[in-house]
C-alpha cells in the first residue's frame, strides 16, 4: 500500500516525535505483564527515531478504565520497555496535564517520555479534537504504530492527524508491516489459500467470511461458531452455542461456497460436556450424536485429523479464532493441535491477533508462524475489505 506515508518518507532529524503505540498488554492479578509481544513490536520504530536524533513521546491505552486507577497505569509498561531498550523511560503522571507538558517541553534528543494511559482522558475514545490538539502541540511529528487500534476513530489515532501535514505524519514499521501482510494476503496469496476461522460467534466474523469466500480455495470453520452452521445443515447440536438469528446467513455462506467451488469444512466430531468447566465430565462424540443438554466445547480427534489433511497442501493459511474454549485446559487440545499443524507446514501462515495469538503463544509455536498480527479487530476489518480510520488518515492525498 504505497500511498500510505511511511516513517521513512519523513525528515525526522532532531525532531520531537509522538509515537502512538499499542501497549495494551495482558497482566496478571499482580499487574505483571504476561505477554510483551506488543511492546517488543514497537521497538524498531522507537529505535529508528532515536537513531535520527529525535526526542520521543510514546502514548498508548491499556484496558478500558472507567476512571483513573493505578490498575490501568502504564508504569509496568515503562519498566518493561526500559529493560528491552536498556534505556531510561521518563514516565508522565498524566496525559495532557502539567506533569506531562513540563516533561515533554524539557525532553532532550535521545530521551523517551511515556504518557500515562490515554483512556484516562474521557475524550480519547470520543475522537475529541481538543484532546488531539493538546497532544499534537507537544511535538513536531506524528507516527502511528498502533495497528491494534487503527479500526477505531480515537483522538490519538484519527483526530490528531488533522494537526500535521503530510511531511510530518506517517506510519511506523509495525503498522506498515501489518497492512502489507493483509493486502498481499487478499490480493496475491500463494495457492492453495486456506482460511481457518473459529471463535465463538458467527456475528463477529460474518463480514470476513463473506469477503473471504471468493478469495480462498478452502474454508475451515471451527470453534463455537461452527454449531450455527451445523444447525443450519439440520444437525441436532444439544445445548451448544447457537445464534438462531444467523441460521439463514450461515446457509447463504454454505450455498455461496458451493456456487464458487470453495469446499467448506466443519467439525465431524466434538468434545462434549454438560457444562463449560474444567471438572465437567466429557466425551468425544460425532456431531450428529451430541447428547441432549450437552454442548460441544472443542473439536474432536477426527476433526483434528480431517483439518490436518485439509491444510496439508496449503501454500497460504490465514487463521482467526480458536477451535474451542481454549481458556479451559481440557477444551484447548483442538486449538493447540491446529496451531502445531499450521506452524509445522510450509505455508505462509498469518495469524489474526487476539485469542488466536494467545493460542499460538500457549502452544509454543509463535516463532514458527510467518506473521502474527498484533490486532484482532483491526486485522479482521482489513480482511473484510474495510478502510481503517487510523490508516486512512495517513494516506497521501496526491494519490487520490
UniProtKB/Swiss-Prot annotation:
Residues reported in the UniProt entry to bind ATP: 205, 296, 327, 353-356
Pfam families according to UniProt: PGK
Subcellular location(s) of the protein: Cytoplasm
Reaction catalyzed: (2R)-3-phosphoglycerate + ATP = (2R)-3-phospho-glyceroyl phosphate + ADP
GO molecular function, one term: ADP binding
Keyword Kinase set for record: yes
GO cellular component, one term: cytosol
Residues at which substrate binds: 22-24, 38, 61-64, 119, 152
CDD domains linked to this entry: Phosphoglycerate_kinase (cd00318)
Alphabetic keyword roster: ATP-binding, Cytoplasm, Glycolysis, Kinase, Nucleotide-binding, Transferase
Any GO BP: glycolytic process
Record carries keyword ATP-binding: yes
Broadest EC class assigned to this enzyme: transferase
Pathway(s) per entry: Carbohydrate degradation; glycolysis; pyruvate from D-glyceraldehyde 3-phosphate: step 2/5
EC number: 2.7.2.3
Domain of life the protein comes from: Bacteria
Disulfide bonds: none
Subunit-level organization: Monomer.
Family: Belongs to the phosphoglycerate kinase family.
Name listed for the protein in its UniProt record: Phosphoglycerate kinase
Native source species: Campylobacter jejuni (strain RM1221)
Amino acid at each position: 500500500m504505497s500511498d500510505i506515508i511511511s516513517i521513512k518518507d519523513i525528515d525526522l532529524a532532531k525532531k520531537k516525535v509522538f509515537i502512538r503505540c499499542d501497549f495494551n498488554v495482558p497482566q496478571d492479578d499482580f499487574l505483571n505483564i504476561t505477554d510483551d509481544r506488543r511492546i517488543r513490536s514497537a521497538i524498531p520504530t522507537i529505535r529508528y527515531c532515536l537513531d535520527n536524533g529525535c526526542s520521543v513521546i510514546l502514548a498508548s491505552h491499556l484496558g478500558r478504565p472507567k476512571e483513573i486507577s493505578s490498575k490501568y497505569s502504564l508504569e509496568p509498561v515503562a519498566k518493561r520497555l526500559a529493560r528491552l531498550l536498556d534505556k531510561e523511560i521518563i514516565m508522565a503522571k498524566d496525559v495532557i496535564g502539567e506533569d506531562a507538558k513540563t516533561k515533554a517541553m524539557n525532553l532532550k534528543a535521545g530521551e523517551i517520555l511515556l504518557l500515562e494511559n490515554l483512556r484516562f482522558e474521557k475524550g480519547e475514545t470520543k475522537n475529541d479534537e481538543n484532546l488531539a490538539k493538546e497532544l499534537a502541540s507537544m511535538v513536531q511529528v506524528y507516527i502511528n504504530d498502533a495497528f491494534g487500534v487503527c479500526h477505531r476513530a480515537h483522538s490519538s489515532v484519527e483526530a490528531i492527524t488533522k494537526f500535521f501535514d503530510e511531511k510530518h505524519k506517517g506510519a511506523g514499521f509495525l503498522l506498515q508491516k501489518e497492512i502489507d501482510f493483509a493486502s498481499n494476503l487478499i490480493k496475491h496469496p500463494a495457492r492453495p489459500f486456506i482460511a481457518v476461522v473459529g471463535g465463538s460467534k458467527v456475528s463477529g466474523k460474518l463480514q470476513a467470511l463473506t469477503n473471504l469466500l471468493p478469495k480462498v480455495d478452502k474454508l475451515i470453520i471451527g470453534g463455537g461458531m461452527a454449531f450455527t452452521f451445523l444447525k443450519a445443515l439440520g444437525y441436532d447440536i444439544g445445548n451448544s452455542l447457537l445464534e438462531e438469528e444467523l441460521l439463514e446467513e450461515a446457509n447463504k455462506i454454505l450455498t455461496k461456497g458451493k456456487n464458487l467451488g470453495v469446499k467448506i469444512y466443519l467439525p465431524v466430531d466434538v468434545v462434549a460436556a454438560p457444562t463449560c468447566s474444567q471438572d465437567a465430565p466429557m466425551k468425544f462424540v460425532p456431531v450428529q450424536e451430541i447428547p441432549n443438554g450437552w454442548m460441544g466445547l472443542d473439536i474432536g480427534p477426527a476433526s483434528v485429523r480431517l483439518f490436518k489433511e485439509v491444510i496439508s497442501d496449503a501454500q497460504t493459511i490465514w487463521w482467526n479464532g480458536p477451535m474451542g474454549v481454549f481458556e479451559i485446559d481440557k477444551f484447548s487440545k483442538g486449538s493447540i493441535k491446529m496451531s502445531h499443524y499450521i506452524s509445522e507446514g510450509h505455508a505462509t501462515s498469518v495469524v489474526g491477533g487476539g485469542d488466536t495469538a494467545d493460542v499460538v503463544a500457549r502452544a509454543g509455536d509463535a516463532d514458527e508462524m510467518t506473521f502474527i498480527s498484533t490486532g484482532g479487530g483491526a486485522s479482521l476489518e482489513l480482511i473484510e475489505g474495510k478502510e481503517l480510520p487510523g490508516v486512512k488518515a495517513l494516506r497521501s492525498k496526491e494519490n487520490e
